[in-house]
């Protein structure tokens, strides 16, 4: 009887899944160009202006002349309501002005997160005790399965790697980083364990192919799995690489990278870190918009003009990962979790801090257009760079309107945007916000518009001050303030800026971020940065 009941239950589950599939039309399969055209058709756009070229010899090369960089010099006032009334109290900011900005950002720039986003169930794939440099850690690989019962044809499994110091005396702050994570230094078999593995493997091979006996007798010292340095040896077996030290600073010689990897700096300071794979949340291309979390919620159908783009989707996924840390990891100080990213992931980090309330801080690296750079600036990367087929998927469909040269509504340009990036930075207040850039000569290209990002940071300052915090400590006149010299730390407030002397990375600013964040959250290193390998 129990067996019959079990079989009936299995049949019922199968029928329910089949019914869910039959109720949904098949997911649409578009190329990026087809999806882009679909959105143009929805918006009534007939033609878009091409984005500027990074090739200095091209006819439409990007502008790098500061005299031509500000065709729309006046930004929307971050502390003026749409009715013209000045915002003078924190209550007016929270209850009136910020909601206005959020609505415009949602509708026109980054898109709306649906109200019916599904739940995420996390599973620990493996947990491993490892060493990172001299710090003993516990490293975990996790999968967050997104409930796809509404559209079983689409699977979304969020990938996260979590690394925490093993000997912490209490909960530690964590920096979550957008990127492709892996276990830092997987533990290896001891010599005795390796010998046992080799004996078993040889026996298995001989049983499968007795002719191998002659080969093994000719090479008696051969071992299929041999200890090796780093990740050498057959199939990567071998001890981890030995501890590394940062090279000493060289006084008077700028541009020399003396920094350990960011992950090692974090652990040495008593932090943990997590890496979250953005592509496991939402593909980084337009062809993927009917898949991933955006496609799942839309049941495989194309976006509407105010639907979310990949930047909001990545931010949503990061927030679900923070939900897991808060609920399941007592050694994580969930009130002091930050978000980090560089380049497109720098954009995502800024969007995450602005929208997701549980994140306490961000290190926003070289984020450019769609991130900290002012949209109204004509310098390097432009709005039109993000309205073409290559990068439009980051944004709401409505963002395409601001690159339109011919449409049923006429044409629009960046000056028509109701909001700009200084307001995105202001949305982060009162949380700790560190804007980071590098040196164009070292690879952090002028294309990113460091000056335009500095202007946006300056223009966001009044909101931090209204909320009783400190900004960069200079005037809020974004039209006249110029960037300070390279390597000048502007870290006295909760809004921070530093341009380092390296390339397209934020590793060179990590020690500055940690010093600044530690001071603001009252963190003291709680782990030993030295350790002995077993």
Where are these regions (language model features)?
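Short beta-strand element of the alpha/beta-hydrolase
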Residues: 159-161, 170-180
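Alpha/beta-hydrolase fold nucleophile elbow
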Residues: 331-343
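Cap/lid segment of the alpha/beta-hydrolase catalytic domain
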Residues: 177-334, 368-378
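N-terminal pre-domain segments of enzymes
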Residues: 19-113, 231-241, 516, 525-534
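Conserved strand-to-loop "acid loop" that flanks and positions the catalytic carboxylate
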Residues: 429-449, 500-502
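C-terminal catalytic histidine-bearing segment of alpha/beta-hydrolase fold enzymes
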Residues: 440, 455-533
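Mobile cap/lid helix-loop segments that gate and shape the active-site cleft of serine hydrolases
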Residues: 252, 293, 304, 320, ...
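Glycine-rich nucleophile elbow surrounding the catalytic serine of serine-hydrolase chemistry
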Residues: 341-353
């Amino acid at each position: 009887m129990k067996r019959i009941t079990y079989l009936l239950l299995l049949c019922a589950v199968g029928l329910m899944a089949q019914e869910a599939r039959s109720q949904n039309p098949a997911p649409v399969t578009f190329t990026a160009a087809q999806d882009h055209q679909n959105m143009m058709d929805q918006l009534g756009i007939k033609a878009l202006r091409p984005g500027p070229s990074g090739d200095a010899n091209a006819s439409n090369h990007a502008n790098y002349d500061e005299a031509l960089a500000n065709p729309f010099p006046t930004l929307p006032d971050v502390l003026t309501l749409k009715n013209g009334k000045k915002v003078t109290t924190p209550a007016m900011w929270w209850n009136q002005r910020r909601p206005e900005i959020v609505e415009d950002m949602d509708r026109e720039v980054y898109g709306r997160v649906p109200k019916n986003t599904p739940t995420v169930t996390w599973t620990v794939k493996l947990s491993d005790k490892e060493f990172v440099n001299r710090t003993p850690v516990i490293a975990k690989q996790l999968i967050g399965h997104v409930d796809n019962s509404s559209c079983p044809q689409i699977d979304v499994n969020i990938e996260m790697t979590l690394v925490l110091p093993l000997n912490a005396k209490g909960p530690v702050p964590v920096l979550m980083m957008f990127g492709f994570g892996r276990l830092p230094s997987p533990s290896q078999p001891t010599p005795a364990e390796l010998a046992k593995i080799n004996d078993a493997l040889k026996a298995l091979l001989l049983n499968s192919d007795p002719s191998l006996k002659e080969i093994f007798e000719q090479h008696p010292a051969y071992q299929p799995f041999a200890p090796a340095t780093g990740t050498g040896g057959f199939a990567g077996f071998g001890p981890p690489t030995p501890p590394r030290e940062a090279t000493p600073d060289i006084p008077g010689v700028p541009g020399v990278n003396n920094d350990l990897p960011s992950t090692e700096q974090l652990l040495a300071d008593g932090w943990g870190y997590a890496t979250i794979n953005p592509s496991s949340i939402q593909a980084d291309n337009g062809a993927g918009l009917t898949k991933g979390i955006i496609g799942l919620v839309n049941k495989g159908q194309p976006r509407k003009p105010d639907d979310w783009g990949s930047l909001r989707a990545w931010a949503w996924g990061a927030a679900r990962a923070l939900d897991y840390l808060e609920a399941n990891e007592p050694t994580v100080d969930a009130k002091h979790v930050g978000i980090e990213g560089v380049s497109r992931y720098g954009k995502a980090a800024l969007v995450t801090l602005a929208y997701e309330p549980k994140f306490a801080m961000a290190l926003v690296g070289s984020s450019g257009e769609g991130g900290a750079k002012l949209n109204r600036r004509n310098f390097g990367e432009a709005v039109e760079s993000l309205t073409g087929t290559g990068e439009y998927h980051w944004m709401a469909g409505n963002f395409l309107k601001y690159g339109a040269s011919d449409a049923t509504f006429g044409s629009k340009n960046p000056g028509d945007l109701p909001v700009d990036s200084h307001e995105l930075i202001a949305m982060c207040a009162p949380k700790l916000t560190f804007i980071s850039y590098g040196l164009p000569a070292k690879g952090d290209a002028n294309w990113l518009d460091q000056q335009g990002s500095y202007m946006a940071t300056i223009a966001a300052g009044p909101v931090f001050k209204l909320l009783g915090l400190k900004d960069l400590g200079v005037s809020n006149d974004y039209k006249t303030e110029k960037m300070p010299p390279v390597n000048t730390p502007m870290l006295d407030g909760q809004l921070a800026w530093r341009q380092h002397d390296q390339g397209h990375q934020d590793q060179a600013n990590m020690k500055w971020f940690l010093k600044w964040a530690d001071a603001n959250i009252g963190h003291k290193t709680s782990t030993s940065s030295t350790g002995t390998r077993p």
